[in-house]
């Protein structure tokens, strides 16, 4: 069996899909379906079982057996960069991850987990997986950074695989439940389909991020499981492309619309990553050599998926 925490969420459900595509259906999805809309991410997928996150954590802490577990993909977390309840964030992202890590280490179960580019904070260069480059801007980034630091202490002694992926700006299918935290491509598509003007912040040609397609993210996760490599790795494309490029690809697909530029909100000033670009040196050195989709390629594929029933 393979366990996917956050399996009804954005990246988790895409990992489930990638496993299904390889013929793997013996999957336990762990999630919190208090937001009932997330079930739509699983309706076209095949899994063996579902368990609530709280029940799962109780069983993990009690050391209960889940049978022959081949791996745990730990994607379950609070991923809101605007959530400032630090106790909630540390319980949910840090403490929970530690419990799961030790469960896996004791049983030598491969543990593949979601870290984040938010660990780098407001940098504009050198997004490198090393302590001197890490300075998160928000409590979400701090919770991810602290767990990475915890993993670094354990890695030299670990007898089983531990791998963390610092996801950059992931976009693609199955993110509709994320609301305001969904990608710009998702929001632009919604605005166009609602007959509204698609909106970007003023200066969006200058805001550049490493936008990585979720299908590529899932592929990297599965490659690492198959190849057994440990470590903490950036997971982006290695390219920074502008929000304007995302909009251009969206409008090109829809063949309509004109961008309306809106003022940059004061509340985000100083807490907003204006530039991200993954340094892929370590990922490539680990042996992953496949190309990543460009914004034009990924957004076009995503638009086709979003509008498949149109």
Swiss-Prot record:
Q: Which EC class, in a word?
A: isomerase
Which gene name does the record give? Answer: hldD
- Active site, renumbered: 140 (proton acceptor), 178 (proton acceptor)
This protein's pathway reads:
Nucleotide-sugar biosynthesis; ADP-L-glycero-beta-D-manno-heptose biosynthesis; ADP-L-glycero-beta-D-manno-heptose from D-glycero-beta-D-manno-heptose 7-phosphate: step 4/4
What's a Pfam family in this record?
A: Epimerase
Positions bearing N6-acetyllysine: 267
Q: Where does substrate bind?
A: 169, 180, 187, 201-204, 209, 272
State the family named in the UniProt similarity comment for this chain: Belongs to the NAD(P)-dependent epimerase/dehydratase family. HldD subfamily.
So which cofactors does this thing need?
Answer: NADP(+)
Q: Which UniProt keywords apply?
A: Acetylation, Carbohydrate metabolism, Isomerase, NADP
Q: Name one GO biological process term.
A: ADP-L-glycero-beta-D-manno-heptose biosynthetic process
Q: Which GO terms describe its molecular function?
A: ADP-glyceromanno-heptose 6-epimerase activity; NADP binding
**Mind telling me what this protein is named?**
ADP-L-glycero-D-manno-heptose-6-epimerase
Reactions accelerated catalytically: ADP-D-glycero-beta-D-manno-heptose = ADP-L-glycero-beta-D-manno-heptose
Instruction: Give the function comment from the record.
Output: Catalyzes the interconversion between ADP-D-glycero-beta-D-manno-heptose and ADP-L-glycero-beta-D-manno-heptose via an epimerization at carbon 6 of the heptose.
Domains (record comment):
Contains a large N-terminal NADP-binding domain, and a smaller C-terminal substrate-binding domain.
Complex and partners: Homopentamer.
Residues binding NADP(+) are: 10-11, 31-32, 38, 53, 75-79, 92, 144, 170, 178
> So what EC number does this one have?
5.1.3.20
CC cofactor note: Binds 1 NADP(+) per subunit.
Output the CDD domains linked to this UniProt entry: ADP_GME_SDR_e
